[in-house]
Amino acid sequence: MGSCARLLLLWGCTVVAAGLSGVAGVSSRCEKACNPRMGNLALGRKLWADTTCGQNATELYCFYSENTDLTCRQPKCDKCNAAHPHLAHLPSAMADSSFRFPRTWWQSAEDVHREKIQLDLEAEFYFTHLIMMFKSPRPAAMVLDRSQDFGKTWKPYKYFATNCSATFGLEDDVVKKGAICTSKYSSPFPCTGGEVIFKALSPPYDTENPYSAKVQEQLKITNLRVQLLKRQSCPCQRNDLNDEPQHFTHYAIYDFIVKGSCFCNGHADQCIPVHGFRPVKAPGTFHMVHGKCMCKHNTAGSHCQHCAPLYNDQPWEAADGKTGAPNECRTCKCNGHADTCHFDVNVWEASGNRSGGVCDDCQHNTEGQHCQRCKPGFYRDLRRPFSAPDACKPCSCHPVGSAVLPANSVTFCDPSNGDCPCKPGVAGRHCDRCMVGYWGFGDYGCRPCDCAGSCDPITGDCISSHTDIDWHHEFPDFRPVHNKSEAAWEWEDAQGFSALLHSGKCECKEQTLGNAKAFCGMKYSYVLKIKILSAHDKGTHVEVNVKIKKVLKSTKLKIFRGKRTLYPESWTDRGCTCPILNPGLEYLVAGHEDVRTGKLIVNMKSFVQHWKPSLGRKVMDILKRECK
């Protein structure tokens, strides 16, 4: 075997250095662009040839070996029979180890003018170079072809001829660099041991990113074929010109070495056998190059040609073999509620090319591009992290007492907290009973009691009480005023209970800001400027939705500006909420935290007054100077 051929086998000559094994930043952990090891793709696979010496019967063949002065030695002759191991010269002999079995070869049938050798692969592979070592004189003309569709179509890699112009009508790359034909490997000398070497990463491909589309088109193969088109004789001079040579008309090849690697787009450094593929039993098959990638960089597929199921937030890319950039696939943001996602180019473009992942088949009663909200009929349980499988709980609204939301035919609760929209006069978290002062729970809600006090919620009969106060005066006509820049609260069916709406049953002591020592002595957890948005009767308690406009004090609590809920003392205990909190108005509120639940409590110990800038300044001064 020639020196360059041995170098190609051992180190890959310049091909590997310029190509796949020269990937920037290659490491065993495949942190950057990486490629599986290279090897002989013919090893462990079946090589095909049109004919084989002695395939039908024993044949006689002869060959010359020349001296240095080109005079022919005495020809040597032998027999071949494909059915007898010691006389066989099968195509598989071209794929065995060139070092362990250097004197084995394939030989065609006698007097064959055209011959074909073909390697069929079970998957797509990267092909880098071919080394052929001839026992017979090299052909006067031959073609190297490849297929990328398992033999359906073929494209030429290289033409070989003693005269490219005369044989194929092509220019010779010995004269014109980069031409598709060459005369370099078509000389009949030497009569035996002549090499043919083809490098797939020759110019102009040797400077490209080895995973670019251009290089893939050049290197990717599923089949490789060599067509031997024209024999030529050994050029040595016979001493006896009258002695006609016999049995020299055949092709014979020692080695057919197809160097390449598993094709993984730069996303794997190891490969395993393709499912269902069985290697040919031959010595050294444990060194064979397998065809299914063990993908890294969050990629998947036999060739890491697409992103893993939950990593489609950006377009898939091959790694960059020049810079070493792995171009990893990025995970979709599905909040733990989906196993797969897909890339949507419209979503990608709408995001400014930042995120294009759309979660598939959201689980755990969630929906949305990122499974980011509960489905209609479910609400967000704030006690659980949203990634928890039970973060969305089913609404439990009473079918009679709950109102149907606009544009829906089914009753749904507030998806943020599970509150049900109740019909007029209906109370309770699930809208399952009448409010105090109402009766006749039914399809149209509950009716007001025709009493000065409360009435029986079922019959409507008045219930007398010594605490009842005359209700026969008119209620003030109060309507909450919303700032046009602020969105109005949507749950209008749940009305707020306050002394203003139920003044006949409620007496709240007017609060004044006394001395600073008394104010500081209350040790309030929070002091806020708020605007009342709405109040909601929950049957056992009232929730007041507010907008925090300014935080004057907060201790261990993390309180921010924006919407929040306050929890006044239960109106079921007092008949109203005290201190008075009327929707649409602004207040200064100082109160305590329920250490068990973390709720902001408003009760008779709280300080509540209508907001005035002067009041705010005075309280801030007390907090800074006195409350230490």
Curated annotation (Swiss-Prot):
Gene Ontology terms: biological process = animal organ morphogenesis; axon guidance; basement membrane assembly; cell migration; substrate adhesion-dependent cell spreading; tissue development
- Give the intrachain disulfide bonds: C262-C271, C264-C293, C295-C304, C307-C329, C332-C341, C334-C359, C362-C371, C374-C392, C395-C413, C397-C420, C422-C431, C434-C446, C506-C576, C520-C627
| Domain Laminin EGF-like: start-end pairs | 262-331, 332-394, 395-448
Matching entries from InterPro entries are given as:
Laminin/Netrin_ECM, Laminin_N, LE_dom, LMN_ATRN_NET-like_EGF, Netrin-4_NTR, Netrin_domain, Netrin_module_non-TIMP, TIMP-like_OB-fold
What superkingdom heads the lineage?
A: Eukaryota
User: Which of this chain's residues carry glycans?
Assistant: N56, N163, N353, N483
The protein's job, in short, is:
May play an important role in neural, kidney and vascular development.
What binding partners and quaternary form does the record give? May form a homodimer.
Q: What is its main location?
A: secreted
Q: Which residues form the Laminin N-terminal domain?
A: 30-261
**Protein name per its UniProtKB record:** Netrin-4
GO CC annotation? extracellular region; laminin complex
Does the entry feature the keyword Kinase, yes or no? no
- UniProt cross-references to CDD domains, sorted A to Z: EGF_Lam, NTR_netrin-4_like
Q: Which PROSITE patterns match?
A: EGF_1, EGF_LAM_1, EGF_LAM_2, LAMININ_NTER, NTR
